[in-house]
């Protein structure tokens, strides 16, 4: 039986407005609900820890975009953007709304995505679980008052029902879990997973569709700004160091994961941070550690009986997380925007151990590496990943890009030219051998190299080409051992290094074929040669 979209909308409005849907609860009220409902446990740091059960990371194979005529031609359909028919979406959302209508209480948050008011999304988030609502409160941009929240007329709504399981045969999903985006109905429908990151990444996917349509670049990156107004962007996939490297004591954080770049400069899409918490220590990452307090949500961290948190224990997953409002970081830009960037850093965790720890890129090389998006998938950020796997994620964010990647590359190229931005490739992965043989590049050295790039120390530095990749590598950086700058020198067997490097080059070349003749110039002018 066909489901009418208007009926769905009425059901959704009914859910939001019914007295048992608790609207815009404070942090304290949500804490009380979380503890009363036995959803989470209080830690000695004051943060609440949540165990998300079966799903401790995103489920990319369970993500769909509704195949709607007005949007069909713009979407880059494939394994990332899987289509689902509108009728199936409406039927499933009808079931989810009926399911939520049976609940004693629901939790509703109104807020925003995007700190630039001209392009801001107005959001309503409807949650089955109180802790998911606190997550939304922490991660999206919060209105200044309940009065302001009540006046928000949403142009996108998240409906999250983690305990609702889909029937794949009937509902057209890949499993009992689903994350479905409808641009026509302006809804993100989530079910079958308690992993809260699906909400934030769902909205990021939406912004990655909407912003480029207005000639605004959307980016999977962190950003910070120095005392003189100099802005740096850090691109990279989960676990490559975006959050860690952008949290610098002498620079103000703009945001740790999602940004837009328009005619005025950079703006944060979010109102919070979602930091990896595995092996977190006050010594290594003081800003993040100090943000873990009352109001913060920890995901899948091990908590001892006395409430003490063991950040080193990966019993549940490597992908432990901390979600906190951005103002829990002392050193932030207010509001979360800044001028045009001076420096862009592409972060990659190279599990082969062959890329230089830092190299300077031409614009053509920058576009090649942006489209390639090479990194290694790190343990726990997706289901089934237990050790690093070399992978290519277009634009350092393929799972979240609804449009053809060339659109994002085109925008980036124009902006690099217009604002004369310096671009660097930074390997935060391995040196002296591949994963299992070599060692992870020291965070202390990576911080120093990044600092040198951002502060302009490398502008007049001497560079030399590395013999295999042809990348421009600085000959010397203060307080960084010369032995690691040229990666071949860090390997005990240089022939083994060359063989491993050629293996990686062949993977780059093979991967880039998917972009076809349209990107041939980028490959010829900026690409690796087999």
Curated annotation (Swiss-Prot):
Q: Offer one Pfam family short name for this entry.
A: PEPCK_ATP
Q: Which Gene3D superfamilies match?
A: 3.90.228.20, Phosphoenolpyruvate Carboxykinase, domain 1 (3.40.449.10), Phosphoenolpyruvate Carboxykinase, domain 2 (2.170.8.10)
Give the GO terms filed under biological process for this record: gluconeogenesis
The pathway it acts in is: Carbohydrate biosynthesis; gluconeogenesis
Query: Which residues hold substrate?
Result: 58, 195, 201, 321
What CDD domains does its record include?
A: PEPCK_ATP
Q: Do you know which PROSITE patterns this protein is assigned to?
A: PEPCK_ATP
| Cofactor binding comment, as recorded | Binds 1 Mn(2+) ion per subunit.
* Single GO MF descriptor: ATP binding
Q: Which reaction does it catalyse?
A: oxaloacetate + ATP = phosphoenolpyruvate + ADP + CO2
Give the UniProt subcellular location, in the record's own words.
Cytoplasm
> Highest taxon of the source?
Bacteria
* Cofactor(s), by name: Mn(2+)
Which residues are listed for Mn(2+) binding in this entry?
201, 220, 257
**Main subcellular location of this protein, as a coarse class:** cytoplasm
> Which positions are annotated as binding ATP?
201, 220, 236-244, 285, 321, 440-441, 446
Annotated EC: 4.1.1.49
Q: Which UniProt keywords apply?
A: ATP-binding, Cytoplasm, Decarboxylase, Gluconeogenesis, Lyase, Manganese, Metal-binding, Nucleotide-binding
Alphabetized InterPro entries for the sequence: PEP_carboxykinase_ATP, PEP_carboxykinase_C, PEP_carboxykinase_N, PEPCK_ATP_CS
Cellular component, GO annotation? cytosol
Q: Which family does it belong to?
A: Belongs to the phosphoenolpyruvate carboxykinase (ATP) family.
Q: Which HAMAP family match?
A: PEPCK_ATP
Q: What does this protein do?
A: Involved in the gluconeogenesis. Catalyzes the conversion of oxaloacetate (OAA) to phosphoenolpyruvate (PEP) through direct phosphoryl transfer between the nucleoside triphosphate and OAA.
Q: What is this protein called?
A: Phosphoenolpyruvate carboxykinase (ATP)
Upper classification of the source organism reads:
Bacteria, Bacillati, Bacillota, Bacilli, Bacillales
